[in-house]
Amino acid sequence: MTKGPVRLDVAVSYALPRAGLPSAVSFRKWVAAALKGRIREADLAVRVVDEKEGCSLNHHYRGKDYATNVLSFPAELPEGLPKGIKMPLLGDLVICAPVVAREAAEQGKLLAAHYAHLTVHGTLHLLGWDHEDDKEAEAMEQLEREILADLGIDDPYAGEH
């Protein structure tokens, strides 16, 4: 765990009308909560997309023919950087607004809480967390619960296990 303030640069872009979508300030708050105590500085991008772009990206990068709620693209540092130079570039998050809205409605969740959860979830992926097996999934879900609780958001996994 790192202590002290986080230097954070979150570029938020919207590929569809912003009405009803979280503000850039909200996305920054959620990313900062996920990074708190884990990393001192980070630059990342959040792009909110429609279903067509979400499906295209999921197909291209994961071979899946459907849009998913969040995609995480960790940054890869270029070869040949002098030793000791650490780039704060963390990566990119792509959040598919129609999928998030549909899931929130189907699961009876507040839309803003679901966006917060998926932003935290995606940011943790950028930090190297994963859920490929049950042990990893439980550890990641517990961390998500703690981060969201700090934000005043209920357990997103309540009733699932």
Swiss-Prot record:
Cellular compartments annotated: Cytoplasm
One Pfam family per UniProt: YbeY
EC number(s) recorded for this UniProt protein: 3.1.-.-
GO molecular function: metalloendopeptidase activity; RNA endonuclease activity; zinc ion binding
Cofactor note: Binds 1 zinc ion.
Enzyme class: hydrolase
InterPro entries per record: MetalPrtase_cat_dom_sf_prd, YbeY, YbeY_CS
Names of the cofactor(s): Zn(2+)
GO CC list: cytoplasm
Keywords: Cytoplasm, Endonuclease, Hydrolase, Metal-binding, Nuclease, Ribosome biogenesis, rRNA processing, Zinc
UniProt superkingdom: Bacteria
Residues the record lists as binding Zn(2+): H121, H125, H131
GO BP, sorted A to Z: rRNA processing
Keyword Lyase annotated: no
NCBIfam families xrefs: rRNA maturation RNase YbeY
Family: Belongs to the endoribonuclease YbeY family.
Function according to Swiss-Prot or TrEMBL: Single strand-specific metallo-endoribonuclease involved in late-stage 70S ribosome quality control and in maturation of the 3' terminus of the 16S rRNA.
HAMAP family assigned to the protein according to its UniProt record, in alphabetical order: Endoribonucl_YbeY
Protein name: Endoribonuclease YbeY
Species in which this protein is naturally found: Xanthomonas euvesicatoria pv. vesicatoria (strain 85-10)
Lineage of the species this protein comes from: Bacteria, Pseudomonadati, Pseudomonadota, Gammaproteobacteria, Lysobacterales
